[in-house]
Amino acid sequence: IIVVVNLINFDSIKKGEKMKLFENNLDTKIFALGGLGEVGKNMYCVMHGNEIIIIDSGVLFPEDSLLGIDYVIPDFGFLKRNEDKIQGLFITHGHEDHIGSINFLLQSVNIPVIYAPNQAAKLIKKKLIDRNIKYDNIVIFDENTKVKFKNLEVEFISTTHSIPDSFAIVVNTPNG
């Protein structure tokens, strides 16, 4: 996964002018609910004010010592407690460590919309049909798509990966 957050353009600050780091006195928070220090279970959040976007919702395949366990999924507790702030789920590509827990997520948390590249969207739809989960709000994006919320704007950069239709996600916030 690649998350790119734009940096402050110091050239745009006039001489003698104080640099304003935080718009509206709100912090932008970027954190992982899975995927750090492990290969799998990728799930990241960007939060600004009352808006949260989620990036990926993957599974971790268990080690041999976890007998009887098929998948390890992220802890959705934070998302459940902040369900009203969720603007959408953004998928970078169709590997299971990035989409494998979507069916579990949708059964636990209200996700208003899933944004995914075409190939990943097809894989997600198949996964949901196989598990009898009805969900109709999957929006397909490409490198020309921009998604704008009140405080967050999301853009996409096509990347080369071992699966077609993979993207980096660019998140613009009032803080950069």
Residues of each region from the PLM?
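Short, Lys/Arg-enriched N-terminal segments with co-localized hydrophobic residues
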Residues: 1-18
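Short Pro/Gly-enriched beta-strand edge/turn motifs at strand-loop
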Residues: 23-29, 149-154
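A short catalytic or substrate-binding loop motif that flags glycine-/basic-rich loops and adjacent residues
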Residues: 24, 36-40, 160-165
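Divalent metal-coordination and catalytic microenvironments
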Residues: 30, 56, 93-94, 154, ...
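Pre-active-site segment of Zn-dependent metallo-hydrolases
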Residues: 36-41, 48-91, 103-112, 116-120, ...
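Metal-dependent phosphodiesterase/nuclease catalytic metal-binding core
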Residues: 45-50, 54, 166-176
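Histidine-centered catalytic micro-motifs
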Residues: 89-99, 159-163
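Metallo-beta-lactamase
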Residues: 119-166, 172-174
